[in-house]
């Protein structure tokens, strides 16, 4: 069969199939003729095509390739999968052990050439060295020292009672010394010693608030007679704002209940009577001042007979210069 401008060839096979080939058909549409001499049975299956060539790329080979060059440490979490999608096997060793680090520990067990050189300590200049002062030996402390046996007490004085008498009666209950610390309350009458040389006393009557009260009463033993020595000093404020004070030389009558804080402790009389033990002193000797023969030995113990030092309070009322002898004055403040 022929057509205009085209050539058609028809081939009939033994199985009755027809193959049509056109001369002007593109090469992509050409079909290969079936071989008639093929001995392949019709029900046979064609062999599968050969698999495509695969790349023999493994993580170990990649690590071997990178081992020759320097390894760049990356930040962040390591990859879980490689470029081909296969799981990456992590090394059991930590990252810190991958690259050896320089040790800063000095090994003293090696030879002397490899030992670290220690720089000697710089000597401190003598100008920066503080001198050490030695404390003077004051003798041995007895187990019954004043600091260990100081006991505070509160004495309550009722209205109308004498504060001085109440404190002295409390001190006579034992052989302890009495130290008056403070007091609060109001007094109605007080007798104070004059600060001038006349030796007189002044008595103030009225209502005075106690600002401060202090004093000491020490036990003394003179010719087998035990007594108390000491005194008190007081500062008072009047209702009009004036302040009077001085050594208590007589009554100190309470106008309201007064609380007095005192402390009891062991006196130093028994400790001074003991013979002092010789002690070695390593202090520099200083030249002694010449002393007269009538000066008593410093080891002689004298009982305390004088009271507290006279205060420098000045009386609120001027004293009359005509009185040249010891006189007592009774002054009432309203």
From Swiss-Prot:
Which InterPro entries does the annotation name? AHL (IPR039605), PPC_dom (IPR005175)
**Region feature (Disordered):** 1-103, 109-128, 306-334
Highest taxon above the source species = Eukaryota
Q: Where is the composition biased (Polar residues)?
A: 90-103, 306-319
Please note every region of biased composition (Basic residues). Answer: 71-80
Bias (Low complexity) ranges: 1-21
Q: Which residues form the PPC domain?
A: 147-287
Motif interval(s): Bipartite nuclear localization signal: 72-80
A GO cellular component annotation here is: nucleus
Kindly indicate which segments of the sequence are annotated as binding DNA. Answer: 72-84
Q: Where is the composition biased (Pro residues)?
A: 44-54
Gene3D superfamilies attached here? Hypothetical protein, similar to alpha- acetolactate decarboxylase, domain 2
Provide this UniProt record's keywords sorted from A to Z. DNA-binding, Nucleus, Transcription, Transcription regulation
Q: Which CDD domains does the record match to this protein?
A: DUF296
GO MF, one example: minor groove of adenine-thymine-rich DNA binding
Where in the cell is the protein located?
Nucleus
The entry's function note states:
Transcription factor that specifically binds AT-rich DNA sequences related to the nuclear matrix attachment regions (MARs).
Q: What is known of its domains?
A: The PPC domain mediates interactions between AHL proteins.
What is this protein identified as? AT-hook motif nuclear-localized protein 2
Origin organism of this chain?
Arabidopsis thaliana
| Phylogenetic placement of the source organism | Eukaryota, Viridiplantae, Streptophyta, Embryophyta, Tracheophyta
């Amino acid at each position: 069969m022929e057509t205009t401008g085209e050539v058609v060839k028809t081939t009939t096979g033994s199985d009755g199939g027809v193959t049509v080939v056109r001369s002007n058909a593109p090469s992509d549409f050409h079909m290969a003729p079936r071989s008639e001499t093929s001995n392949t049975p019709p029900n046979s299956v064609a062999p599968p095509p050969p698999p495509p060539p695969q790349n023999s790329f493994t993580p170990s080979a990649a690590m071997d390739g990178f081992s020759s060059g320097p390894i760049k440490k990356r930040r962040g979490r390591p990859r879980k999968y490689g470029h081909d999608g296969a799981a990456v096997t992590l090394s059991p060793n930590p990252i810190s052990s991958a690259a050896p680090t320089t040790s800063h520990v000095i090994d003293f067990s090696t030879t002397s050439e490899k030992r670290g050189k220690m720089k000697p300590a710089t000597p401190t200049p003598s100008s920066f060295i503080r001198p050490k002062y030695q404390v003077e030996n004051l003798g041995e402390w007895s187990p019954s020292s004043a600091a260990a046996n100081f006991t505070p007490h509160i004495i309550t004085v009722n209205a109308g009672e004498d504060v001085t008498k109440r404190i002295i009666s409390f001190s006579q209950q034992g052989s302890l010394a009495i130290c008056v610390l403070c007091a609060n309350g109001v007094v109605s009458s007080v007798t104070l010693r004059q600060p001038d040389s006349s030796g007189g006393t002044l008595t103030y009557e009225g209502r005075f608030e106690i600002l401060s009260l202090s004093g000491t009463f020490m036990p003394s033993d003179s010719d087998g007679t035990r007594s108390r020595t000491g005194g008190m000093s007081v500062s008072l404020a009047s209702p009009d704002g004036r302040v009077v004070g001085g050594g208590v030389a007589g009554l100190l009558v309470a106008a309201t209940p007064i609380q007095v804080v005192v402390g009891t402790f062991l006196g130093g009389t028994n400790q001074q009577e003991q013979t002092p033990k010789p002690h070695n002193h390593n202090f520099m000797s200083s030249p002694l001042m010449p002393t007269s023969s009538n000066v008593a030995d410093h080891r002689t113990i004298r009982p305390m007979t004088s009271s507290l030092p006279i205060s420098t309070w000045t009386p609120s009322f001027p004293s009359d210069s005509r009185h040249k002898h010891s006189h007592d004055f009774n002054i009432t403040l309203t």
